[in-house]
Amino acid sequence: MGALINNLLYLRYPTRHCTYKLAKFSTGCGLWQDVRMASGPGLPDSLVLEIFLHLPHKAVLSAGFTCRQWFAVSRDEFLWKELLYNYYCIPRSVPRHPAAVSWYREFKRLYDCIPCVEVQTLKEHHDQVLHLAFSHRGHRFSSCSKDCTVKLWDTERSDGTISLVHSSSMRQFNWGYTQFSQFNVDDTLLLVSGVYLGPHQSSSGEIAVISLENYTLLSRVRNKPYDVFGCWLNETHLISGNLHWIGNMTSCSVLWLNKAFQDIESENVNVVKRLFKIQNINASTIRTVMVAHCRRHDSPDLLLDYEAQSKAQAQQTQQHQPLFFDLGNTDSEEEEDEDKEDKEDEEDEERGEKRVSAHLPSFNPSGIQHVIHGRQSIAARERELETKVARLMGSRRTKAPDPNLVSPSAHGEGEDKTYLLFTTGSLTYSPHQIGIKRIMPDQMTTCGPVLGEERSTDEFFDSLDHVIDIHGHIIGMGLSPDHRYLYVNSRAWPAGCVISDPMSPPPIAEEIDLHVIDLKSLREERRSLRAHRAFTPNDECFFIFLDVSRDFVASGAEDKHGYIWDRHYNICLARLKHDDVVNSVAFSPADQELLLSASDDSTIKVWRSPRMVRLAEAPQRPPRARKLLSSLLGRRSANLNGKP
């Protein structure tokens, strides 16, 4: 590096009578060992700037302490703009963050304010840790684990460490493990979701509501399938799910609104109310429900793919249409008796097998393969026929959507909207679509009929207001703090794949894509993030929880790392190491420079930014002594007021 700078000086000023001696430059520590001028005037600012452009940012900061001139150049805006674009490999089409006041401070934010320094490891769990959730104030967080406990932790200790406050075991309720938790808006109640191990209910889950005042159990709610998870709608009401099979491949998902505690003042007050009934085809179900309170979208637009957006605006193309379509005419089917349908399907399958066995050839390998192929063909035809019947019957039994309920918000629109978001599917059982259903104000209470408003037989099912197809297996979702953007983890299907059998979804990629959906325009942004990996196949694929702060988005991965990206520049800023799969991450809502990560290695790691670590380790300054002049003035003032 020193030779490079000397060559630059010689080429730029070969005839000057002043010589500049640059001693050894240590790239490891990034410090100038000796920089002095033998004779002649100082270097011009333009030359110093050119030299600094060839140095790492640490060397620029160190060189800035040489003299006042170099310090001024080391804070040059053009210099730090170039350093930022080059260091993070950001495309030049991406502008500076709209909230940034300078390029120097923006570089400092990206480099020094990322929670990437491990400061504590929590080992109180004895099995895989599956989920983390902060309270809205950030003073506590909860953790769920396969050890079937939910634990509460305190983050406001005077020494800056995190300590365990409370632990509740859910095995007494016949749970297999806890998988998800969420604080209500005022941080007085905790929703805990787990997998219930009751008889013949392998897919069933349960939701428990715990008071954070005295840690008592307030209520328990059935939740099927268990990966609906559940969520809060407001301070006192939560949403759960139930599933009714009406065929081998067709089912009905019912979403319920539940009071968080049993009302004992009157037996006439409802504690539950049905929100929606939605038809599922091709063995798909509704999962991962969450509520987005979109309050007028006053936040600025988060531009993610600047080149694509500029081209789209110039050409006014319709590239987003495949990702933004209406399911108002979704085919659905009338619900019938589940046991009766199962028996009829079993009898049909037995008759099909008998027809095949009647034409069974001699027992040789080719004959066996022919029989197996015949059975598979019959099963596939039966599934295809069931789907066609479900679509036909459902088209006559689904409530028509109101196009005004969910529509892209116009600029300056003042109406608040509440959306119910969930994963679903239409082609196969693996979740590959985001369903959006608006919740109206009169639906946010359990008052009124338990089964909701009266409807005719032609309105048996509720239609989805909008669906966004991700074209891959969805393994995680998270909302931005302002609830405008939905971030989705998915593993993509091969391009151009065709699904002929809903029970055999396409193979999924090892890379995890992180998509961003703008709930204002109801579109998926074209540019997705890809840096983390997963390796499990379709039938073993599990949920990877992600979290979003004001400036960053973080996610776990199966490659034993957590990842942090910048939301504006779409760049990966840090990798957080664990000894096994990272299942969940969580930013503190009070301080985005504090991050938690949970792993299959049974630990929770606490990460803070380099800036916060330095502040915590810096010795506290002693109180400043009162100056003599201020002391004399204080005494004089006291004497004037008549005090001795």
Language-model segments: residues:
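Skp1-binding F-box subdomain of Cullin-RING ligase substrate receptors
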Residues: 24-119, 148
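Canonical WD40 repeat/beta-propeller blade segments in eukaryotic WD-repeat proteins
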Residues: 127-133, 172-182, 226-231, 473-477, ...
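Terminal intrinsically disordered, low-complexity extensions flanking WD-repeat/beta-propeller proteins
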Residues: 219, 225-230, 243-475, 498-515, ...
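A short helix->beta-strand "capping" segment at the edge of beta-propeller domains
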Residues: 105-127, 161-169, 453-467, 525-535
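WD40-repeat beta-propellers
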Residues: 132, 150-155, 201-213, 249-258, ...
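Conserved strand-to-loop turn within each blade of WD40 beta-propeller repeats
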Residues: 144-147, 490-491, 556-559, 598-601
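Loop/turn segments within WD40 beta-propeller blades
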Residues: 132-139, 183-186, 231-236, 469, ...
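Structural hallmark of WD40 beta-propellers
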Residues: 60, 138-142, 188-191, 236-240, ...
